[in-house]
């Protein structure tokens, strides 16, 4: 997870823990939402339709995915089940290689990679990671009443750990 998203979560937790707070603050962590504008499937569909190339940053890049329905369900589930300060995440299974999605979409379009259409490796963008992290190193997963929704629990005494914030910020600066 990127530093800015992590800081946003920590800000929500700090608001939840504020003395005068009367609002219930929670966060959900999404994977990539299939079919949303800007999603890899939408981009690949367009690239295939115009004859390519299909662009992939790196053959080893993996991402977690969820459907629009799963994203909506996660938000609704968190609203009904979540407690203030919660961070909830959907069990999205194993991460998927982006290049495998590209190859599958090419094949499903009746085309052959390398013959009918090419895959072009473009290189990672500044700040882009090979692997997404759904769970921070300082967190453990806890089951909820819903079998596919997990609660993230901070493993340290303080959920707002300035050392981790500093590490996240350093990582963001180095990655850019």
Give, region by region, the residue ranges found by the protein language model:
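Active-site His/Glu-centered metal-binding helix of metallohydrolases
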Residues: 7
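Catalytic tyrosine of NAD(P)H-dependent dehydrogenase/reductases that use a Tyr as the general acid/base
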Residues: 1
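Strand-loop microenvironment adjacent to phosphate/nucleotide-handling motifs in alpha/beta enzyme folds
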Residues: 12-176
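Active-site helix of classical SDR
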Residues: 4
């Amino acid at each position: 997870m990127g530093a800015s998203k992590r800081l946003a979560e920590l800000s929500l937790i700090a608001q939840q823990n504020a003395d005068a707070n009367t609002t219930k603050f929670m966060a959900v962590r999404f994977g990539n939402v299939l079919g949303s504008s800007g999603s890899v499937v939408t981009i690949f569909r367009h690239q295939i339709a115009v004859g390519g190339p299909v662009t992939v940053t790196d053959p080893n890049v993996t991402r977690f995915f969820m459907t629009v329905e799963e994203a909506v369900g996660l938000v609704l589930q968190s609203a009904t089940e979540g407690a203030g300060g919660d961070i909830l995440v959907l069990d999205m299974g194993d991460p998927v290689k982006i290049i495998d999605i590209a190859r599958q979409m090419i094949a499903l379009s009746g085309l052959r990679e390398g013959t009918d259409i090419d895959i072009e490796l473009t290189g990672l963008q500044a700040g882009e990671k090979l692997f997404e992290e759904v769970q921070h190193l300082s967190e453990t997963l806890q089951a909820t009443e819903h079998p596919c929704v997990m609660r993230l629990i901070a493993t340290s005494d303080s959920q707002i750990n300035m050392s981790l914030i500093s590490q996240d910020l350093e990582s963001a600066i180095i990655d850019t």
